[in-house]
């Protein structure tokens, strides 16, 4: 069983790395599979709810998620078995992205990538089974109980969703974490009896918050500083690239990618960038 868990985990990490690398080198591929509200709700491209979990914005983003996945997955894999482990992983990825879709359903330009929701689910599954395990950080000379880390994680995610002051996918984190708890209880009901207090301590704030935003959506109608900043940057850097020669247009587009990120380009800009890339390749 131990060898099977290790092999399966490394296969998952390898697939995620290959898909992410393909996204790094091919903007069209990245754009085709990332999580984008408009593509999912209007164009019905539901596969993006899962495919986005295998893409990342950078090598650092990828490495951070895969290291966290490896650290917490071995224990969960041994306890639940391979099939149930992947149920937690993919289920958390899907539910995390569904929560992000619900919260950002009015933001058609919102997009995201990353395995963070799935990894959060695995982390919280691990905490459900081993709430008293000690978690340490390289930059802090102390350890904290896993359940305390889980509670802190939930509260930070709730604050991040409410504040909307950065480009971190707090919605996917919270949705994935809660999914990891629920799926683990479904697969192993006895853990609720054994570890009911830490599980409730992590779950109640998350469930309460989700119920509040379901019944009072106006709670989320605060200025989205990241969205406004990105929108302003887009408008400021807007250029008619058809009026420029290819070299100048390419330089302008690459400069904009550096400033606001590829997934914040308009559809026309992405199309123009792909056209210029094909010209260079030919």
Where do the protein language model's features map onto the residues?
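C-terminal regulatory/interaction regions
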Residues: 229-282
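A detector for small-residue-rich transmembrane helices and their helix-helix packing motifs
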Residues: 1-244
């Amino acid at each position: 069983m131990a060898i099977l868990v290790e092999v399966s985990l490394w296969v998952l990490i390898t697939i995620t790395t290959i898909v992410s690398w393909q996204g790094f080198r091919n903007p069209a591929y990245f754009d085709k599979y990332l999580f984008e509200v408009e593509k999912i709700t209007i164009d019905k491209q539901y596969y993006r709810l899962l495919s986005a979990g295998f893409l990342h914005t950078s090598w650092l983003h990828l490495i951070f998620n895969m290291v966290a996945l490896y650290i917490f997955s071995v224990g969960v894999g041994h306890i639940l078995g391979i099939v149930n482990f992947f149920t937690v992983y993919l289920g958390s990825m899907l539910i995390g992205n569904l929560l992000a879709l619900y919260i950002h359903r009015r933001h058609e330009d919102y997009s995201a990538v990353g395995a963070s929701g799935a990894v959060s689910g695995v982390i919280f599954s691990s905490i459900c089974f081993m709430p008293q395990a000690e978690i340490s950080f390289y930059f802090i000379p102390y350890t904290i109980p896993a359940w305390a880390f889980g509670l802190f994680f939930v509260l930070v995610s709730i604050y991040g969703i409410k504040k909307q002051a950065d480009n971190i996918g707090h919605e996917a984190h919270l949705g994935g974490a809660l999914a990891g708890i629920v799926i683990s209880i479904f697969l192993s009901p006895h853990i609720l009896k054994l570890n009911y207090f830490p599980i409730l301590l992590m779950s109640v704030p998350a469930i309460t918050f989700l119920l509040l935003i379901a019944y009072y959506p106006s709670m989320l109608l605060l200025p989205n500083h990241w969205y406004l900043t990105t929108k302003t940057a887009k408008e400021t850097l807007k250029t008619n690239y058809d009026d420029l020669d290819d070299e100048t247009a390419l330089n302008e587009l690459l400069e904009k990618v550096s400033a606001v990120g590829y997934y914040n380009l308009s559809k026309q800009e992405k199309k123009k960038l792909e056209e210029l890339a094909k010209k260079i390749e030919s």
